[in-house]
Regions:
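C-terminal, well-structured catalytic/ligand-binding subdomain of enzymes
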Residues: 1-18, 41-43, 48-204
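Short N-terminal edge-element motif at the start of the domain
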Residues: 10-37
Length: 204
């Protein structure tokens, strides 16, 4: 905790969308605030812009076992152009991705506590299966396939789990060049009534 103003995570996201025109501007904005821990948990988000730059923003402290005081959490920023610390695969790739675990090294003492690690690895394997697509350039169709692959209900079912209450409520594919977004509700990728495309013409 510092003398910076407190900010909740949802308000922070709204602030970035309203006032940041690039990754650098987003990071500059976020650094002006302390993230208020209303959910008693660590946080991370990823931001990107139309230049291809991205960054993972993580708020944590020490380790998963001791990270219980939100006032002690600090922001760490990992850019896609400088994330060697995250691992060899992340260093080789020029694209980033996150699921439901903190990517900061040594945060977890046991890999089983890294919730979503299996889906994290699946994303990389789908985008860069043979190691040659380090730029992460894929078609919109393939990007949607990735989102469908790692939806919680489908993923759990394919791995022998049957919690029917687990589902990815919505998935979205953003085209930061064309300023469009394709939005899918409740993993219903094959249902045209559940797939919506929005064109943010006013941003062009």
């Amino acid at each position: 905790m510092t003398d910076k103003p407190d900010l909740t995570s949802t308000t922070m996201l709204r602030m970035i969308l309203d006032y940041a025109g690039s990754v650098d501007e987003a990071v500059e904005l976020v650094r002006k605030y302390d993230l208020h821990d209303s959910a008693n948990t660590s946080f991370h988000y990823m931001v990107a812009d139309s230049t291809g730059k991205s960054a993972i923003l993580e708020w944590g402290n020490a380790s998963d076992e001791t990270d219980t005081d939100g006032t002690k959490r600090e922001l760490k920023v990992y850019y896609n152009t400088d994330d060697t610390i995250l691992g060899e695969t992340e260093d080789a790739n020029k694209f980033q991705y996150i699921t439901n675990f903190i990517v900061t090294p040594d945060y977890y003492s046991d890999e089983k506590d890294m919730k979503g690690l299996d889906r994290y690895n699946a994303i990389e394997s789908k985008i860069n299966p043979d190691g040659s697509n380090t730029e992460g350039i894929i078609s919109a169709e393939t990007a949607m396939d990735v989102l469908e692959l790692v939806g919680r209900r489908k993923w759990d079912a394919s791995n022998g789990e049957s919690d029917k209450n687990t589902i990815t409520v919505w998935s979205a594919l953003y085209n930061l060049t064309d300023k469009t977004v394709t939005w899918v509700s409740n993993e219903e990728f094959g249902n045209e009534k559940a797939v919506f495309t929005f064109d943010f013409e006013y941003l062009k």
